[in-house]
């Protein structure tokens, strides 16, 4: 089962409570990047292209706890970089569990065998192992041969030790629906508790700029994949059925970037997990000081092809709460994989992209250099 009954009940109660209180914007999952340092250099990743002085930064345990206290989300997803490079990661996970949060710890599994004894199985804790398809697909995606076998070994080890274990799979242009469906069958046989799948986002700093999916290609790809698995019912996904329905082109959704806010070494990232257009010092500043109407499909050029879960899963969850009847046909027959697509959001009036990455890097480097000797954070990586 991808989501435990306890998690479904707790998160559902939280969402309903927010609506009853009349809150228009609220966080569902805290996205935490406690460091950018990684032991891979994936072709489609735009998260690690920083100078060493920034790659060596990390969030302290106290900063990580402060982030969840500020935003109050019921779930935390810890990414990076590679989180297992963070020396204090076991303490961070324990701190979130002590606060009764549901924790997803993302990893490429290269260090999992070495680190797994530092963690204890808990129904509220899940490993999320990066696996972008079968052996050829995944090794090409991460630009290192042999990583697929290590990820599969990590899945088997985690399951043997009694951990809840899921995979996170990002798909790019050129992905073949038949191969992806066969891959989903294979990881299901491995006993994973769930699959998180999403199209890749076109990071401006990613090394490979040629293989990101357009919205049209995303919809066709997911219809092809899901049609080979009984509308997706053959597999256990961690995401809302309505989000999968959206990926298949059957829903017209605007994104809710505040539903999965990101805290990283720069601060609270504006406006979302994918776009670093600015940074706030506090969660409240992020929520109150971001002009949300400036971002999203049809509003901003960088958002044009985005269909990623960190922007649209929150929308799908809200839709399932406010219009629960939409879930019934999905439960009965799965995602519709034929017929016309739902209308898409027009792009005619989107504002042009602004490129601010270099400015943010320069400002962060200046901040690091201005610190007094002896006040530098400890090295992030081992």
Regions found by a protein language model. Name each.
Residues 52, 85, 113, 136, ...:
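Generic structural signal for helix capping and beta-alpha/helix-loop junctions
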Residues 59-60, 99, 123, 128-132, ...:
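Radical SAM enzyme [4Fe-4S]-AdoMet core and its adjacent flexible, acidic
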